[in-house]
Amino acid sequence: LVKATKDAKHEIIISQNPEEEGAIPLRRSLNENDGLEFSYSWWMFVEDYDYKKGSWKHVFHKGNVDAWPLRAPGVWLHPNDNKLYVYMNSYKEIKNEVAIDNIPIGKWFHVSLCVSQDHMDVHINGYLKVRKALNGIARQNFGDVYVNSFGGFSGYVSRMRYYDYAIPISQVQVDVKNGPDLTLPYSSQQKPPYFTPYWWVNEYE
C-alpha cells in the first residue's frame, strides 16, 4: 500500500477500482479454516502533538471518504494524548474500538493489526498489546484505502502492507526486523529524521 516513507500530512487514496490507474485492489480474506482473516502492518513516526492540537489525527482507514460509518479498519491518533485508536466494523457493531496508551513520540514504531473472525490483535514492535473481542464477525467493505486524510498527523508512515490472512507472530517479527523504508517516493518536501538503527527493535514501553 505504501512501499516507502511518506509525509503523514499529505493524503493518498488507494483506489479499489481495478479499472482506475494506480489502483491496488485488496483481495478479500482467504477464508481459511478459521474463517474471515486479514491483517495490516505499518511503521509510524510521530513528531509531536502540537499539530492539529485538539483534533483527531488520521492514520488510515478503509471505507467511505468521510470515514463513517465504514471503517474496517480505521486508525487514528487521539486529539490531545499520545494514544492510538483502532476501530473495526463488525456485523453487529459499527464501532468496535481499542485504545493503546503511551505511543512513542520522536521514534519509529511498528504496528500490526490482525483480524480473525470475531477478534482483533494489535502488536506494537512485535509485542501483543491488546486482543479485542469484537461484537460479531468482522465486516470487510469494498471502499478505498485512505492514508493520512483530513490533514493526517505530524510525522511519517512507512511500509504499509495488507495481508488477506491473519499473519502469525513470525511474520510480524519479520516486518519489525525489516524496519521502515528510508526512501521518499511521494511528494514529501523534506527528508525524514535520521534513523538510529536500534530504535525500532527495543521493546515498546
List the predicted regions and their residue ranges:
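Extracellular glycan-associated modules
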Residues: 1-205
